[in-house]
């Protein structure tokens, strides 16, 4: 499939916490959709190796959720560095979307962009500067059409690939119920 400028890149990161100055990326996943939100391809899901010191510094919430999901064990067993994740992700994306044209798509994507800017700037540069942030749409729906909110439920697995799939489904839901386009 040729790279298409109208395709959208969806990304999700799992991190050891919320502060890019001290916390690290431990998982990355990407999906490419067409402009109608149809999934065209799922990229690699990469657990990124981090030191025991980095993992031990996680707060209780992250220890619990990433422990229960098995992500901590996958991170410990992983041979992938941040650089490996950058290279594999860009190789995947370049097959579907030219550099610099797709907004970064996802939920609370500004947070992911902060971590990419700090630890994976080459990958962050692959995106257009604009974002398609499903959480912004959700906040508007909560205020303008609160009755619509109960119609979509997420699993909340905090697994990168599942989170992206849910974000795409959530935006489809809002498009159908709110935007009607």
UniProtKB/Swiss-Prot annotation:
Main location: cytoplasm
Keyword terms: Cytoplasm, Exonuclease, Hydrolase, Nuclease
Top enzyme category: hydrolase
EC number, UniProt record: 3.1.15.-
The keyword S-adenosyl-L-methionine belongs to this UniProt entry's keyword annotation: no
GO molecular function terms listed in the Swiss-Prot or TrEMBL record: 3'-5'-RNA exonuclease activity; nucleic acid binding
Domain Exonuclease residue range list: 8-171
GO BP terms in the entry: DNA metabolic process
One family name in Pfam for this protein: RNase_T
GO CC field: cytoplasm
Active site, per annotation: 129
Subcellular location as annotated: Cytoplasm
Gene3D superfamilies: Ribonuclease H-like superfamily/Ribonuclease H
General function of this protein: 3'-to-5' exoribonuclease specific for small oligoribonucleotides.
Family indicated by similarity: Belongs to the oligoribonuclease family.
Name recorded for this polypeptide: Oligoribonuclease
Origin species: Shewanella loihica (strain ATCC BAA-1088 / PV-4)
Taxonomy of the source species: Bacteria, Pseudomonadati, Pseudomonadota, Gammaproteobacteria, Alteromonadales
